[in-house]
């Protein structure tokens, strides 16, 4: 994400009086919400609550981007649940109830808490009930940078997921392990990024397990990364359209 955009986001919150309540950073996938939330939380010694359902799955750490969140000393990042693919889709209403309970628990103790997220289902529910929430809330919508830069950024993000983290785990191994469970194929295929890989597997008549065990050629890596990057951009543009329609122009909305 461009440094100037991050500085603008920080400045917007600097103009808001910091007191017990929720300070939300919302926006499209892959634009640096986690980094900005970390920066804000550290500057105020506040916890971060992640308003995201897919990041709750311990067997999708790379796929969801959770594995790449910086482990910053002194930072407390809280997820809404600790689930596995076998449990299936995390019901949006259940997830939202959990989100409000977690946020309320911090505010009731007199704490300020940073909320970060791009989950359309959770952020829309948050917006629809914002006037009735049991705590004050401030929302900052982070904008997508220029579209061409965003696509290149998401392709690079996809490459990172395909290559994996320091443990050797990557998006392909997570997909292969989840796919053999057999009972959650529809849910798995609904996850952005995984849907692109499954389409590639179907086109080339290979299973996710076979693909995960291959040494990817540059050509295949480029093809998968471009497909996934395009999917992330498509999803990100939809997120931004919905969030701007809901909260208004990029910037801070207070309640």
Curated annotation (Swiss-Prot):
Its EC number is 2.5.1.27. Keywords: Cytokinin biosynthesis, Plasmid, Transferase. GO terms for biological process: cytokinin biosynthetic process. It is an enzyme of class 2 (transferase). It catalyses: dimethylallyl diphosphate + AMP = N(6)-(dimethylallyl)adenosine 5'-phosphate + diphosphate. Induction: During the interaction with host plants. It comes from the Bacteria. Pfam families: IPT (PF01745). Signal peptide: none annotated. The keyword Cytoplasm does not apply. GO terms for molecular function: AMP dimethylallyltransferase activity. Belongs to the isopentenyl transferase family. Transfers dimethylallyl groups to AMP as part of the biosynthesis of cytokinin phytohormones. This is Adenylate dimethylallyltransferase. It comes from Rhodococcoides fascians (Rhodococcus fascians). The lineage of its organism: Bacteria, Bacillati, Actinomycetota, Actinomycetes, Mycobacteriales. The gene is fas4.
